[in-house]
């Protein structure tokens, strides 16, 4: 080993020298040197023979990370997922050399470990009888699986731009296992349980009993507030992303943050959900001459350009704004828009907008949406002196990397001509 070539009195200096080089401006020069040494001494092949426990604390050579990841990914591909080992390995490697170069791969296997832990907790499957209890379980526990899956695909998507010849094919094999665990086990079994449990209540009442309804949002949350109310409506901002936002707001703002849910109106598309969040006594549907559907609140159009009017019909001191309009404004301009207002609706569109570009952009857009909504909250608190803020959505979304099978799809005509009724979609 190298310790035989270095005098004892120089070991500390040599260690500091290499450590500073690793994090210094010329680190890329060191990478080239180390890669040459790896090839010359066939270190990759040698390290593959070393037990994982002995490699975890080893740094300096970049190929150590690749050897560790290769072993773990190979085991995952062979259905061997040691949850504790993976979590401990990732946490240990975070602080060592060259982690940033392969961070997305480590983050990917970390999410696999979390998904496997969830699977082990619920290996008996989902067999809850009452729909309201499934709802409760999802909003308190099951949503975590959606978060793990989203974070996994954020990491996997990053790997497609970073690239590593030794890891990329293995990562794709791991992705196949993730799809099986999430799409076929989690969505499949939980979806079947939910469909069976809610069928009778939906048929008899058109909603899930004892679950808050989206159509009641304004009357229950906004109408009777004594103080000025701000409502941020983020298009397609689903429940599990809201849970991540809530956690960050608690940590960063030291505010009282609570997370709730409600059943969205059916079908869960923008025009229906946006209408449900506006004040109304009755929602109705008008079919235009071109076949498009228009949603009316007490006879008034709820299209984007008319929402300010709908709000003012209930409370004249109300205003509807768009984040993309107020974001570039000066503080004084923004403040003038909300001066004297009791109810302020701020519409935000990041996730849904991304879905119109590419499905693969939806998960990255969730992180962007979180940051933008935190900025809206900052504006409300610091510039508008707001203390009561609701963050909600018109609908959520369901995304899988692997395409849905034909029997998972619904004929569009079934949606267009079905009377609006509550749907099993949660939101903040």
Task: Describe the residue ranges of each PLM region.
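N-terminal, non-catalytic alpha-helical interaction modules of very large eukaryotic scaffold proteins
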Residues: 1-2, 7-46
């Amino acid at each position: 080993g190298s310790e035989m070539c270095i005098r004892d009195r120089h070991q500390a200096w040599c260690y500091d020298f290499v450590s500073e080089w690793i994090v210094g401006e010329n680190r890329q020069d060191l990478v080239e040197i180390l890669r040459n040494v790896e090839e010359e001494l066939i270190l990759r092949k040698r390290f593959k023979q070393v037990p994982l426990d002995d490699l975890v604390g080893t740094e300096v050579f970049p190929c150590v990370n690749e050897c560790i990841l290769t072993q773990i990914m190979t085991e995952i591909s062979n259905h061997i997922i040691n949850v504790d080992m993976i979590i401990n390995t990732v946490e240990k490697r975070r602080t060592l050399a060259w982690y940033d170069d392969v961070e997305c791969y480590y983050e990917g296997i970390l999410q696999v470990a979390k998904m496997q832990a969830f699977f082990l907790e619920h290996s008996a499957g989902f067999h809850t009888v009452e729909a309201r209890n499934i709802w409760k379980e999802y909003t308190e526990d099951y949503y975590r699986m959606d978060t793990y899956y989203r974070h996994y695909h954020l990491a996997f998507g990053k790997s497609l731009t970073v690239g590593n010849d030794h890891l990329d094919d293995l990562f794709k094999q791991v992705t196949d296992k993730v799809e099986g665990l999430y799409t076929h086990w989690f969505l499949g079994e939980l979806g079947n349980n939910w469909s069976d449990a809610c069928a009778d209540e939906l048929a008899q009442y058109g909603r899930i009993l004892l679950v808050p309804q989206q159509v009641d949002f304004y009357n229950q949350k906004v109408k009777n507030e004594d103080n000025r109310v701000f409502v941020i409506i983020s298009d397609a901002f689903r429940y599990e992303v809201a849970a991540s936002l809530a956690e960050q707001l608690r940590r960063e703002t030291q505010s009282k943050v609570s997370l709730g849910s409600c059943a969205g109106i059916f079908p869960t598309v923008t025009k229906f959900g946006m209408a449900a969040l506006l004040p109304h006594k009755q929602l109705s549907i008008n079919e235009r001459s071109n076949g498009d559907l228009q949603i009316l609140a007490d006879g008034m159009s709820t299209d984007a350009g008319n929402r300010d009017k709908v709000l003012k019909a209930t409370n004249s001191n109300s205003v509807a704004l768009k984040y993309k309009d107020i974001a570039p404004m000066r503080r004084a301009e923004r403040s003038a828009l909300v001066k004297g207002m009791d109810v302020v609706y701020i519409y935000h569109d990041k996730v849904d907008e991304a879905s119109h570009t590419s499905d693969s952009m939806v998960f990255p857009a969730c992180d962007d949406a979180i940051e933008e909504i935190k900025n809206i909250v900052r504006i409300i608190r610091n510039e508008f002196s707001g203390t009561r803020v609701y963050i909600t959505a018109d609908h959520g979304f369901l995304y899988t990397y692997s395409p849905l099978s034909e029997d998972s799809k619904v004929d569009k005509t079934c949606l267009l001509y079905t009377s609006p009724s509550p749907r099993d979609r949660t939101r903040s």
